Amino acid sequence: MKRIGIDLGGTKIEGVLLTQDNQVVERIRVPTPQNINADQAYMAILTSISSLIEKLEADADVTTRVGIGTPGTISSLSGLMKNSNTVCLNGKSLRADLEQRIGKKVRIANDANCFALSEAYNGAGKEYSSVFGIIMGTGVGGGIIINNQIHAGAMGIAGEWGHNPLLAHGPDCYCGRKGCIETLISGPGFSADYERAGGTPGSSPADIINYAENGDTNAIHSVERFLNHFGRAVASVINILDPHTIVLGGGLSNLDILYHRGRRAIEPHIFSDSFTTPILKNQHGDSSGVLGAAYLWD
């Protein structure tokens, strides 16, 4: 049976059609609806996803199963979406609404869980029995995979590492709290820290690292804060879960600094006499999420 994976992102919605042996036979990307009110955005997202599924199914000569990766998660109490930074989804019955539109059951999981699943299944973490997948991009998230199965937890929030508090009086987070990990080591969080220190507004993380390498004092200090926050945040995961490996994804996973200076920033906070956990870059790139969504049926 062929499978369809859908990845609902902040800027794009991607769909793939997979064969039984996990070969991608078609891929479609469309922009995520923007600049409209929440109700209109939600309806537009439903339409976009349904249209993608219809197009992918047209090229499948057998029955398909559909998996969807999305920011946030489904409440086990209400069946409604919660904790999504695509805020138009919160409080909506996404699964039921999609199933009604396309006339079949769908499986939905948090996008970070889908990322982690794909990397554990046949990506950077395939040789390890337990994987913690970290997404560091526009936001920060995580997913726990044990023996190629998502560990979602009793409330469906396992791995929501980005909303652990790191600084009691840190920057405001969209979730209503302050000093969440996401506000400090996401791309926007890194850039905002540099700007608050007097740096050039609108600088990307790669820009800031380049400025630091060229002697910009504000950038040097901002990079040091970023790495300190990264080290403390990742160490908290290792001390609790002790995964066999950690795989980094999202735009910031392309920063080489994370794999040497970032690793060294973790070590002082590990409650052990040695730090052997591999910190790996993802193998599937920005396709990790959409592949993981398709693997929800495995």
Give the label of every model feature segment.
Residues K126-L184:
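Glycine-rich phosphate-binding loop of actin/hexokinase-like ATP-binding domains
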Residues A109-G123:
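Conserved PLP phosphate-binding loop immediately N-terminal to the Schiff-base lysine helix
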Residues R65-N85, L89-S93:
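Gly/Ser/Thr-rich active-site cleft segment
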Residues D7, G67-P71, A109, G133-G139, ...:
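Short beta-strand segments
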Residues T86-G91, R107-N113, G133-M136, L280-S287:
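Active-site nucleophile and cofactor-binding loops and adjacent substrate-binding regions
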Residues M1-R65, S75-S78, A96-V106, Y121-Y128, ...:
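ATP-binding/phosphotransfer module of carbohydrate and carboxylate kinases, centering on a glycine-rich
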